[in-house]
Curated annotation (Swiss-Prot):
Reactions catalysed: beta-nicotinamide D-ribonucleotide + ATP + H(+) = diphosphate + NAD(+)
Primary localisation category: cytoplasm
Entry superkingdom: Archaea
One Pfam family this sequence matches: CTP_transf_like
GO cellular component labels: cytoplasm
Entry EC no(s): 2.7.7.1
Any one of the GO BP annotations: NAD biosynthetic process
Entry's family note: Belongs to the archaeal NMN adenylyltransferase family.
Coiled-coil annotated residue ranges, if any: none
Listed GO MF terms: ATP binding; nicotinamide-nucleotide adenylyltransferase activity
Protein name: Nicotinamide-nucleotide adenylyltransferase
Pathway assignment: Cofactor biosynthesis; NAD(+) biosynthesis; NAD(+) from nicotinamide D-ribonucleotide: step 1/1
Amino acid sequence: MMRAFYIGRFQPYHFGHHAVITRIAEEVDELVIGIGSAQKSHEATDPFTAGERVLMLYNALENLPVRHYVLPIEDVRYNSIWVHHVASRTPRFDVVYSNNPLVIQLFREAGFCVKESPLYVRERYSGTEIRRRMIAGEKWEHLVPKPVAETIKDIDGITRLRNVSASDSNFSL
């Protein structure tokens, strides 16, 4: 049995992530999906909590044809111990999928087999671009699976994102 690991911040989970995970699922028997920077939320670049992101993925991946686990992974201060940190919080895995140079380097140094993730149209499917559209009031729902858009609406995520992204330069005490 082949079990793979894939990590992302998923702020928010979008069709680019979905395409990558769907392709990985064609090559493995099980998939461990790490919600990276799990401790971060309520920030302009990380507006959603780990629990909200778990829910987004759980709902969006309901029909994924392989067994999968969605687990929060907090950051650690030292890159040299990060792989051990990840491994201690996940089921054992045989291969890591990533295009992130640091993730690739750290897992290879730790002796893991690393494969590059299948590519997607990053210019179109980007968490940064989706968050920008949300703040600007532009259409964004077509860039994420329907259950993700529903989750964001249910938690009033756009209001939160706008509030945490707003400057307080016009306010004085």
